Amino acid sequence: SAASDVYKRQLLLWVTILAGWSAMVAWFSRGLPLNMRARVLVILAAVQLMMLAMLIFTSSPFERTLPNVPVDGADLNPLLQDPGLIFHPPMLYMGYVGMAVPFAFCMAALWAGRLDAVWTRWSRPWALAAWGFLTLGIALGSWWAYYELGWGGWWFWDPVENASLMPWLACTALIHSLAVTEKRGVFKAWTIMLSIFAFALSLLGTFLVRSGVITSVHSFAADPTRGLAILAILGIVIGAGLIAFALRGWRLTVESNYGVKSRETLLVINNIVILVATLVVLLGTLYPIIADSFNLGQVSVGPPYFNALFV
C-alpha cells in the first residue's frame, strides 16, 4: 500500500513485477522450442522497455529531494495501515502485469505464423496464474473495505474497482477459451483476440487509476500527464496486436465441427455473456470521460446504472 500511494513507486513496482514474470517465463519455458521462447521473451522485453522508458523519463523514483529535506515526513494514511492492504496492491499488480504473458505467447505465435493450438497449451497456466493473483487482490480489497467501513463497502462500482474487474472478466473468458482451443482446436481467432483484449484492459486499468481523468474514492497517486504515456503504450499494444492479427489471421481455418448441444456451444454463450458484462462495465466507466470530451457536461455513472444491469 505504501508503494501504491505514490505514482513513481507504483510504476517501479509494475516494472519489477514484470521482470519477475519474465524471469519465471524464461525458467519454466526451457522445454519450449528455442525460437518460440525467444520470441515470447523479446515481446515481454519490449513491454518492459516501454514501461522503463516512461519510468526513467517521466516518473523517476530516484530523484533526489536534497537539500530540501522535510523535518517530519507525513505518515501513511491510517486507513491504509492494515494487514489486508499489505497484500492487496501487490496481488492486483501481479494479476495486471501477468496478463502480459498470455499476450506475449499470442503475439509470438502470430509472429512465427504458428497458429495451431500448441501455443494455447503453453499460455494457459500463465493465464490461470494471473487470474488467480487478480482474484486474490480483488478479494483482499473487498474484504478490507467491508470491515473498514470505507470506500463504499465491499463493492461500490467505483471506477478504480471497475478497472480491476474488467481485466478479470476478460481473463475469465480467456482461460475458458484457451482450454477449448487447446483440447478441441476451435475458436483460435477468438482466443487470440481475447489475449490482446485482456492485456489491453489491464493497461487501461493502470491508466484509469493513475491518470486522474476519473473521479474516484481511490484518489491517491493520480497524474494526468504521465497517464498519457500509459495511454500511448496502450495504443501501441492494441495496434501491434491488431496489425499482427490482420497479417497472420488469414491463415486460421474456421472449424465448427460441434453440435448445437455441446460444450463448445455453451462456452460460446458463456464468453458472450462475459464479454457483454465487460463492455457494460467499460461503457459505464468511460462514459464520464467521453461526455466531458464532447462538452456534454460532468456526468457521474454510479451504482444505480450497474445494479440495474447486473442485478
List where the protein language model places each region.
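Transmembrane alpha-helix boundary signature
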Residues: 1, 24-37, 52-67, 106, ...
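Short, small-residue-biased leader/transition segments that mark boundaries at the very start
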Residues: 2-6
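Membrane-interface loop-to-helix entry segments
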Residues: 8-13, 84-100, 158-167
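Central hydrophobic cores of alpha-helical transmembrane segments in multi-pass inner-membrane proteins
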Residues: 14-30, 101-110, 168-178
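Membrane-interfacial loop-to-helix junctions in multi-pass inner-membrane proteins
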Residues: 24-48, 111-132, 157, 180-196, ...
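Juxtamembrane interface elements at the cytosolic ends of transmembrane helices
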Residues: 62-70, 94-113, 171-176, 208-216, ...
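Interfacial helix-loop-helix junctions of multi-pass membrane proteins
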Residues: 141-162, 212-214, 219
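Contiguous transmembrane helix-bundle modules in multi-pass membrane proteins
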Residues: 159-166, 216-311
